[in-house]
From Swiss-Prot:
Keyword entries, A-Z: Amino-acid biosynthesis, Cytoplasm, NADP, Oxidoreductase, Proline biosynthesis
Catalytic reactions on record: L-glutamate 5-semialdehyde + phosphate + NADP(+) = L-glutamyl 5-phosphate + NADPH + H(+)
Name assigned to this protein: Gamma-glutamyl phosphate reductase
EC number: 1.2.1.41
Name of the gene encoding the protein in the UniProt record: proA
Pathway the protein contributes to: Amino-acid biosynthesis; L-proline biosynthesis; L-glutamate 5-semialdehyde from L-glutamate: step 2/2
Subcellular location: Cytoplasm
Amino acid sequence: MTIAEKIRKIAADARQASLAMARLSSAAKNELLMNMAMALINNTPHLVEENAKDLSAGEKKGLSAAMLDRLMLDEARIKAMADGLREVVGLPDPVGEVTRMWKRPNELTVGKMRIPLGVIGIIYESRPNVTADAAALCLKAGNAVVLRGGSEAIYSNVAIARILQDEMRKDGIPVAALSVIPFVEREGVTEMLKQEEFIDVIIPRGGESLIRFVVEHSKIPVIKHYKGVCHVFVDASADFDMAERIIVNSKTQRPGVCNALETLLIHKDVAETFIPRIFETLAALKVEMRGDDCFRQFAPGATPATEEDWHAEYLDLILAARVVDDMDEAIAHINKYGSLHTEAIITSDYGNSQRFLREVNSSVVLVNASTRFSDGNQLGLGAEIGISTTKLHSFGPMGLEDLTTTKFIVYGEGQVRP
């Protein structure tokens, strides 16, 4: 068979398997995930061996040290993968939950019940742990999943998937409910994106170029997990100690993640007093500042910012900064340059905080808290599939509930429509 024919078969088999997954009880799904977790631990030497092939190939390709680190699996990381599966076991099963019920004048009782999405396609890069994490969440929510990882992790991804599939086979669950596209060619992605007959939704996780490619080529609805151009706005009434603490945490705790701070906005009324302070603090932490003309009046050591800086997701110890006249300008800047990810305001003004919450057009908006809290675990969802910057079907960190949809259920006593 050609690549196109093989991928069509993978997708068709996943569709059939999704029907069986939707019928599984919570107990059966939890038992499967526990068995999968133990299987990962038991197969640690094999996973390390397969991962070494990816690392060797990556070194020959000249991948950066950071990329190789993202690829690497060792005993500790495999244990973390297994722990992640066990964590999903502890999450409430959303499937079958009735979220609302109401009575109609004709005595019909109408409700909404959570059901699986069906078949979820996930396209991702680099980190092989995503194979186990994504599979666990999709399966717990009663879905089948088709995974296409990056070519740089092909040996690791296939090895993880086969271990998990072995446990499905032992439990009598169709292995087609968890499939990995085993082709490194770009055709593997393009053909997967054509399977609208069998795959219900595509979730891409990776860099900007991957997201754009998927959006441009997919015939299937896409839930984008786009870049994080995250902002913090220091309002005129901000407590400076709080603002400094939040900015430092948002920018420096883990600068290479999507919920790290990338652009700092400062109200003009506090620019003269706050900018020298925050510039000195961040400079001591090796953060490069790129500011507009007004910012650099009070921080001469900052580099001039360009238009590109307002769009940038640095994922590094670099921070763009701008002075704004008022709340209107701060909100306008965020809604123009932001990526619908995460924004925060530091303020003592309740009215301003509420306006910021209402008018900023992003998936997570915080008042007096670090952008680093934009995370499924931190927000109480448990494990997440990613952070959606698409308003349909889900917006923000996606937990188990977001891998389901709802259907109407209706109870009658013989009613017919007049």
